[in-house]
Amino acid sequence: INTGYDARFWNYDESVQKTGVLTAAFFSDKRVINIKGLDLFNKLASLLPNISFTIVGESDISVSEFLNLQPNIKVIGVQTKSQMKELYQNTKFYFQGSRLEGLPNSLCEAMLCGCVPIGSKVFGIPDAIGNTGILFDTEKDLEQIVEFVNSDLGVYNFSKARNRIIKKYDFSKRVEKIKKSIF
């Protein structure tokens, strides 16, 4: 039974002017920084110097101890669920550059809030993104991501990401599947 997400809470307001690129990762050592693809996020920021980038979730260590962060990257600490919702709602792109990942909750929550997804082609990430954003294999693909970010994306793209998660992972569908498996 798949994970489910509450589309009523993780909502999207079409009137909000969305900007920037966001990623979220809880990390406690250099290994996690690499697994979560923060080095690729940093490299992408270097290729898009006029766009703001945000890393959410810094924990026991400072990511800047391990990466020479680009000046357009802001690192903020762990956020509450409501704070994450507000960040997602105001952000245009969500980056999930993990090298090892199941089905990322933060990616699905961001897509429900209208973020256009950018993700690596590992495990559950392509299944979540489908054709609503852009998928990449390696650092060599970053130029394609730059073109994608600079393209003219409108409300349709934001809604498309949201609708995919509702269709595949709506919480009410999960509840129904659980009920059927029990009774």
What are the roles of these predicted feature ranges?
Residues 131-140, 147-154:
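Conserved acidic donor-binding segment of nucleotide-sugar-dependent glycosyltransferases
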Residues 99:
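Aromatic "clamp/platform" in nucleotide-sugar-dependent glycosyltransferases that forms part
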Residues 140, 153-183:
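A charged, aromatic-enriched C-terminal amphipathic alpha-helix characteristic of glycosyltransferases
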Residues 86-91:
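Short alpha-helical donor nucleotide-sugar binding micro-motif in glycosyltransferases
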Residues 13-36, 42-48, 54:
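Conserved donor-binding/catalytic core segment of Leloir-type glycosyltransferases
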Residues 4-19, 172:
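Acidic anion/phosphate-binding donor-loop and adjacent secondary structure
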Residues 63-85:
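Nucleotide-activated donor-binding/catalytic signature segment of Leloir-type glycosyltransferases, i.e.
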Residues 116-119:
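Short hydrophobic beta-strand element within catalytic cores of glycosyltransferases
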